[in-house]
Amino acid sequence: MVQRKTVDDLFVHMLSDIYSAEKQLTKALAKFARAASDPQLSEAFKTHLEETQGQVERIDQVVETCGIRLKRMKCVAMEGLIEEGQELIEEIDKGPVLDAGLVAAAQKVEHYEIAAYGSLCAIGKQLGFTKGVELLKATLEEEKATDLKLTEFAERAGNEKAASAA
């Protein structure tokens, strides 16, 4: 196991991890969009896919402005969260119950990302990566907004439809 000796090493590790997470998510969101039966939910997943692609580009900008180099790694946490969503798609018929499950799976992803970006902002600030932190904060705010939209969808329509379908 490679030891991370400095806060700089930790920042690079965490940024590499979330980069992997975002790349994995770009593939998963397209599947979630196809699996959703509610047109608004499907569209929300497509919109977040575009946003996620922009977030990957933003990480590239962070790398450039901070003068760091990402490590090749796989975010196993995101892999597991995506697998949970994939299992729902395989096990539940398309409809309101699956939609409710997809919302829950997507919120787990958002909460992971919110935690990751929040930590990166705090560590980046300690390291003096002012421009990089600005970029990371922009992504953090997007993730929070997406989580809020998912909550609103669940409260407004998704979970109610799922309960009446049961």
Model-derived regions: residue spans:
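Amphipathic alpha-helical hairpins
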Residues: 1-166
